[in-house]
């Protein structure tokens, strides 16, 4: 029930038609009897500056930020977390001590799923993609303790740029391999897809030998089983989609908004109804 004292939260990005954040956060508010409402706030890139300046002065207590605004939001914030600074992206905004602050829970969301899976850090990781999601995944993989990380991207230079950043920030040597050589890797690896390949339900970023793969993680969550995950299943390779990462990053936003982590099971049940 909305009341005059209902606190507003929301998601900014463009477009937002695909997002399930509205449903999972509001389901969690209802489950915990929190007098709050979560809204979709679509902002076209050309109007972003004016819109965000207005939002700063409205009684909105917290925001999630998605594509294409995760980077452009930073200049409008008073402070950002260390991980946001490293990743160059913010996905959670909150008010604290009269300041508008930013954090990145994509990193923590992926790290939490790795911890749940309890994968052996003795294996190497092969990460496909070099966008914003790849950055969060790479730093989570390093935090988890994997000793060897390979990175490949359709644009080689983008992968190289990330490798240089990681070397500077973490003193860790990522091995960059050309996209066309990704399936030639000789050792057994954990494959992590951070690209959009498979979002259409038709393509797969891996047509190589599945005997080389000890685990397949595709951060796409809709469709639930991408062509990559279907192939993993057919080849008896354990696999996971990106739904838990999505839910965990949403739950971790609550830590900034309310001082406690959001209800994972409630949010996941709601998400599964929609997918």
UniProtKB/Swiss-Prot annotation:
Binding site for NADP(+): 82, 129-133, 153-158, 219, 242
Main EC class the enzyme belongs to: oxidoreductase
Record GO cellular component, one term: cytosol
Pathway: Metabolic intermediate biosynthesis; chorismate biosynthesis; chorismate from D-erythrose 4-phosphate and phosphoenolpyruvate: step 4/7
Annotated binding of shikimate, by residue: 19-21, 66, 91, 106, 221
GO molecular function: NADP binding; shikimate 3-dehydrogenase (NADP+) activity
Origin superkingdom: Bacteria
Alphabetical UniProt keywords: Amino-acid biosynthesis, Aromatic amino acid biosynthesis, NADP, Oxidoreductase
One BP annotation, GO: chorismate biosynthetic process
Keyword Transferase among record annotations: no
Catalytic activity: shikimate + NADP(+) = 3-dehydroshikimate + NADPH + H(+)
EC number: 1.1.1.25
Catalytic site positions: 70
Entry keyword Amino-acid biosynthesis: yes
Role summary: Involved in the biosynthesis of the chorismate, which leads to the biosynthesis of aromatic amino acids. Catalyzes the reversible NADPH linked reduction of 3-dehydroshikimate (DHSA) to yield shikimate (SA).
Record family assignment: Belongs to the shikimate dehydrogenase family.
Subunit relationships: Homodimer.
Listed name of the protein: Shikimate dehydrogenase (NADP(+))
């Amino acid at each position: 029930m909305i009341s005059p004292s209902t606190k507003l939260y929301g998601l900014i990005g463009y477009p937002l038609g695909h997002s399930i954040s509205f449903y999972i956060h509001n389901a969690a508010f209802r489950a915990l009897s929190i007098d709050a409402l979560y809204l979709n706030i679509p902002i076209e890139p050309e109007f972003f500056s004016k819109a965000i300046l207005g939002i700063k002065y409205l009684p909105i207590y917290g925001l999630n930020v998605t594509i294409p605004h995760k980077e452009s939001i930073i200049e409008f914030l008073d402070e950002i977390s260390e991980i946001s600074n490293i990743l160059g992206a913010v996905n959670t905004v909150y008010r604290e001590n009269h300041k508008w602050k930013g954090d990145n829970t994509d990193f923590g969301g992926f790290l939490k799923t790795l911890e749940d899976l309890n994968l052996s850090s003795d294996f190497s990781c092969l990460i496909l993609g070099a966008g914003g999601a790849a950055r969060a995944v790479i730093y989570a993989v390093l935090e988890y303790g994997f000793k060897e990380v390979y990175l490949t991207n359709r644009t080689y230079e983008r992968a190289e740029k990330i490798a240089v950043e990681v070397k500077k920030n973490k003193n860790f040597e990522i091995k960059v391999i050309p996209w066309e050589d990704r399936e030639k890797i000789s050792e057994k690896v954990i494959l992590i897809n951070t690209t959009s390949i498979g979002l259409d339900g038709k393509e797969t970023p891996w047509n190589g030998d599945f005997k080389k793969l000890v685990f397949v993680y595709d951060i796409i969550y809709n469709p639930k089983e991408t062509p990559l995950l279907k192939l993993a299943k057919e080849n008896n390779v354990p696999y996971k989609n990106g739904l838990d990462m999505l839910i965990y990053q949403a739950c971790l936003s609550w830590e900034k908004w309310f001082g406690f982590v959001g209800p994972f099971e409630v949010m996941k049940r709601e998400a599964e109804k929609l997918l």
